[in-house]
Amino acid sequence: GPMGPSGPRGIPGPPGAPGPQGFPGEPGASGPMGPRGPPGPPGKNGDDGEAGKPGRPGERGPSGPQGARGIPGTAGIPGMKGHRGFSGIDGAKGDAGPAGPKGAPGQMGPRGIPGERGRPGAPGPAGARGNDGATGAAGPPGPTGPAGPPGFPGAVGAKGEAGPQGARGSEGPQGVRGEPGPPGPAGAAGANGAPGIAGAPGFPGARGPSGPQGPSGPSGPKGNSGEPGAPGSKGDTGAKGEPGPTGIQGPPGPAGEEGKRGARGEPGPAGIPGPPGERGGPGSRGFPGADGVAGPKGPAGERGSPGPAGPKGSPGEAGRPGEAGIPGAKGITGSPGSPGPDGKTGPPGPAGQDGRPGPPGPPGARGQAGVMGFPGPKGAAGEPGKAGERGVPGPPGAVGPAGKDGEAGAQGPPGPAGPAGERGEQGPAGSPGFQGIPGPAGPPGEAGKPGEQGVPGDIGAPGPSGARGERGFPGERGVQGPPGPAGPRGANGAPGNDGAKGDAGAPGAPGSQGAPGIQGMPGERGAAGIPGPKGDRGDAGPKGADGSPGKDGVRGITGPIGPPGPAGAPGDKGEAGPSGPAGPTGARGAPGDRGEPGPPGPAGFAGPPGADGQPGAKGEPGDAGAKGTGPPGPIGNVGAPGPKGARGSAGPPGATGFPGAAGRVGPPGPSGNAGPPGPPGPVGKRGETGPAGRPGEVGPPGPPGPAGEKGAPGADGPAGAPGTPGPQGIAGQRGVVGIPGQRGERGFPGIPGPSGEPGKQGPSGTSGERGPPGPMGPPGIAGPPGESGREGAPGAEGSPGRDGSPGAKGDRGETGPAGPPGAPGAPGAPGPVGPAGKSGDRGETGPAGPAGPIGPVGARGAAGPQGPRGDKGETGEQGDRGIKGHRGFSGIQGPPGPPGSPGEQGPSGASGPAGPRGPPGSAGSPGKDGINGIPGPIGPPGPRPGPPGPPGPPGPP
């Protein structure tokens, strides 16, 4: 029967109580990228501001709009390195000055102190489900922005809990079947029409709200089976549904262009390294981070082509013509119900246990030398090594006239670099710092290619067959009429009821790898975490290669000899001055009686340098000095090797002298070339596997999969036996109305009508109220500690120390016959100073003596006065890049911030490329019988009486 009129609109009920926070809605499509802004001015080098006093942590302000990316300033020509100035006396530490102004971009307030964890509130009643949102029009793809540097790694999101599965909807009532009408007269048989071209699939409109169902009208008489009407057009797009609950606040926008680095200030004095701290236990695992933002929804694949049509069925027996019934009103074709929502994905299984660590791989190939960085600050002076044993003195020279004390010469060239100290033990793990503010979310990556079509599901079981109707009297077979014209466009069908929720389908085949996403913009730098305690001293790495000797300094001019002054404090050792003229050789005096050892005289001024003595015996290796804490100094130039000296004859061994006073600690020498990488560290102990965390909340529903291919038409029914036409008889009188015959077979479908226009997008709904934030989950149990990283390369050697001040000159002993070294005698009276001897040829290097035991670490000497600044050395070859150090422990993750306001929905992206055509689907179940068409008009009555019959046979005679 016809559908009744729609009832009046009901009065809206009172608003319900706010429901619990719903699942996050599907992310909107990426909007088009706006035009590129004008380039900003190049940044200026900011002055180094003085360190200000730490202010109170301010509240986090709103993220400012992202400025246009400025043109990177051109790098200035590096200036020539000036001569190093004289180090001034360390002044008293001044108070910290006010903080300098901060350059662009906009400032971001420091992270506030995390508040106390609130108690989770009771969940509110479930809110009403919002209407489905309208599908936005596909916008043009935005231009690809410039790739920024990689951002900081985001925190790992917590697992969400799986939501409850919705209840299965109830099935709608079945319509009432009308009374069968009398059969109409048989029409003329028409030719079969050509199959029409399949129309392009229309855009699926959003599902509109269900209108009230009108009362069922009285059933009209059943008419003849007419041609089916043209398919109705799609319904108009429904109004946009209410927006989902407010999502969690997104990360701040990307940071602006970083300003150019300011000029480097003079390095401050090196601090005294503190003692190594105790080894701490493993830190606790941080709180799980919030769920990440879901990726954009991928485009749906194209619909597959329809399958081949089945064979035509044989016509059934014709029924007897009946009286024409009153044509019933055409029923409104209901729109097909929208498919139910996809089933929620179950919670992921627990993570598997970590496998055993594999064997350490071979050391990687040597990388290219990096760009030379700025010289680091001056490192702290290392502790002095133990003085080696005094070498065997050479043969005594001829006694010359007593020379006058000369002035102290200029400072000598720096000595060779001392050996690298042993690496201390591993320090305790520092307490994890506060987690930095998460960086901004990068632009969404390009949509991945649509995955391959999943395997078609099994064919459903056939439905139960209906009850067999009563058999009517067979009517006369009608002649098939010509195909009717295409029907007019049907009215928009009423929206159907919600379909029952389908079961979760089998997972489809994994899609192909999507294109790599665009690199995100660099996030703003997080707040500085609390520095952890100093780590234990690590193991000593292998000794690096000895650095090349530096260039000899300029020799100073010999000044005039002044009158002897009082004994002053020992000064720095000067550079070797030119040798003075040799005085006349005096007559050798008779050996005098051995006198009593006198008290040591005052230290005189340093005399001219003496002749080179014979090489002394190799001393015991000194204790390794403490490793400096400063960064490595600049790499010096590699000097050209000097000429090889002539091989001299070995002199007789002299008596063992008293050990001299230890020299002052010199400044660190230039860094040597980086040594080979150290051996891999021991594999760390595997920690116990923590219990599986609670399942996380259900993520947003994934994008809908591509539509499956249309199933093949069902098999045809059994063909009826054709009847034989009888001879045409004389038309009889019009009989009474017979019993209606059986329902005729379904006629051929007519040509499909034109596709309707796609529905327009409805107005946007109002934004819903922000839901309360969910309770924070308990912190997870700390995971197993990671493997120990490879041992870092040994640090660069310090610069060579300056020579200490010369000690007091010892008394010259009496000359005795060359013999085995005797016990050291008491110091004799000071004799006259002999003339400077000529440098002898260098003797052969003696065999290395056995390594002596390592002595205790000597006490740290007092720092000597700062010497004059030396000339600038030439730039040395670039050193090898050091091996990457151990990775620090992750900081404790802070609580999630308050949820932000929902952003406006952007236009949909452009449709993706068509996916590959899937395999043909399995045969579908046979379709239901079509709706009876409108009965045709009754034909005119035939002529009466009929034509005369043929003459009969002759009668019997």
Swiss-Prot record:
Principal localisation: secreted
Modified residues (Phosphoserine): S87, S579
Composition-biased stretches (Low complexity): 23-33, 95-113, 125-138, 186-210, 219-228, 330-356, 365-384, 426-453, 488-516, 576-590, 603-618, 649-665, 707-731, 854-868, 902-935
A Pfam family per the record: Collagen
Source organism superkingdom: Eukaryota
Segments for region (Disordered): 1-957
GO cellular component terms listed in the entry, alphabetical order: collagen trimer; extracellular region
Keywords: Calcium, Collagen, Extracellular matrix, Hydroxylation, Phosphoprotein, Repeat, Secreted
Record note on modification: Prolines at the third position of the tripeptide repeating unit (G-X-Y) are hydroxylated in some or all of the chains.
Residue ranges, compositional bias (Basic and acidic residues): 45-59, 869-883
Biased composition (Pro residues): 140-152, 772-782, 818-833, 937-957
Location of the protein in the cell: Secreted; Secreted, Extracellular space; Secreted, Extracellular space, Extracellular matrix
Coiled-coil intervals: none
Biased composition (Gly residues): 277-286
InterPro entries: Collagen (IPR008160), Collagen_Structural_Proteins (IPR050938)
Expression (tissue specificity): Forms the fibrils of tendon, ligaments and bones. In bones, the fibrils are mineralized with calcium hydroxyapatite.
Family indicated by similarity: Belongs to the fibrillar collagen family.
Subunit and partners: Trimers of one alpha 2(I) and two alpha 1(I) chains.
Function: Type I collagen is a member of group I collagen (fibrillar forming collagen).
Protein name: Collagen alpha-1(I) chain
Organism whose genome encodes this protein: Hippopotamus amphibius
